Design a protein with these regions (language model features):
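Glycine-rich phosphate-binding P-loop
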Residues: 5-19
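ATP-dependent NMP and nucleoside kinases share a basic, alpha-helical "lid"
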Residues: 87-124
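Post-Walker A helix-loop "phosphate-sensing" segment adjacent to the P-loop in P-loop NTPases
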Residues: 24-30
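Short glycine-rich anion-binding loops that position phosphate/pyrophosphate groups of nucleotides
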Residues: 66, 94-96, 170
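Extreme N-terminal starter segment of soluble prokaryotic enzymes
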Residues: 1-3
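ATP-dependent small-molecule kinase phosphotransfer cores
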Residues: 35-90, 127
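N-terminal targeting leaders
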Residues: 101, 112, 119-123, 139-140, ...
Length: 277
């Protein structure tokens, strides 16, 4: 299956290029809106995800660190599940971070000149040039900061991509055809090994998302690794009985063939003494 990620700036040409690439190749075009909808299975609403990605206000630090992990894992699980359903073109930001180690994924960055994006803001928002410029600068700053917090990367770093295109020097049609042509090259074709790696990555993301979303569990330092369907789960739990609960939950996840758990039990004060200590 083919996977193309197209990262782009706000009010750029990313959506148009992605939709055209998908049309040329006959792939499914997906965006954050589709991913957010899929994420609802893990208990994250569209409003919550938008708040994490774009709100100006800062969460209390510990709460933000915890929610950052939850949202990143849920988002990765959703996009991996969609990739398992067939050929996809994903457009948005940080798409290249969803498939680490999957060699047949083609990662694209579209660089649209600021002046062109300002014109788009003016047209869509009904703003004059200076307010539009300020709006765009603020939006870019917020989104870049949040992506760095979520993935610990500078998403504009060109070394994270296979191909960088300057849309000031090409049309949407030409850019789309260039991407489509590159995607057909041998190095971006799936192999049995890369398909297995994608399956394992999807299982890992699903396991992490399900365990994190479960209200029955209290796991810290959670680590999950999948090898050909065999899942290894480790971390710190507050009661020994939770280890079997985790194993039972993981076994029900599609694609899991075997579960091995490696937990350290460290009871919390509330578990030891209750609320009336």
């Amino acid at each position: 299956m083919s996977i193309i990620t197209i990262s782009h700036e706000a009010f750029g040409d990313g959506r148009a290029v992605a939709e055209r690439v998908a049309a040329i190749l006959g792939h499914r075009c997906i965006s954050r809106e589709v991913l957010v909808k899929a994420n609802e299975r893990y208990g994250i609403s569209e409003a919550k995800f938008s708040e994490v990605l774009e709100e100006k206000r800062h969460h209390w630090w510990e709460q933000w660190l915890e929610s950052r992990w939850v949202y990143r894992i849920a988002l990765q699980a959703a996009v991996c599940e969609l990739a398992q359903e067939g050929n996809i073109v994903y457009h948005g930001r940080a798409g290249q971070e969803f498939f680490p180690g999957i060699r047949h994924v083609l990662n694209i960055f579209l660089d649209t000149p600021t002046e062109s994006r300002i014109k788009q803001v003016m047209a869509r928002k009904g703003l004059a040039e200076e307010p539009a410029r300020k709006f765009l600068e603020e939006l870019d700053t917020i989104r870049a900061r949040r992506i760095k917090e979520l993935f610990k990367i500078d998403w504009r770093d060109p070394t994270r991509y296979d191909l960088v295109l300057n849309t000031a020097r090409t049309t949407v049609e030409t850019a789309a055809r260039m991407i489509a042509e590159v995607s057909q090259r041998e190095e971006y074709q799936p192999t049995p090994e890369s398909l297995q790696a994608l399956k394992d990555l999807t299982i890992t993301a699903r396991v992490e998302a399900v365990l994190i979303a479960s209200s029955r569990l209290d796991i810290s330092n959670l680590e999950v690794e999948t090898r050909c369907g065999e899942v290894h789960v480790s971390g710190i739990i507050v009661a020994a009985g939770l280890e079997q609960t985790v194993a039972d939950i993981v076994r029900k996840i599609p694609g899991v063939t075997r579960v091995k758990t490696y937990f350290v039990v460290t009871p919390s004060e509330q578990y030891l003494y209750g609320d009336g200590r």
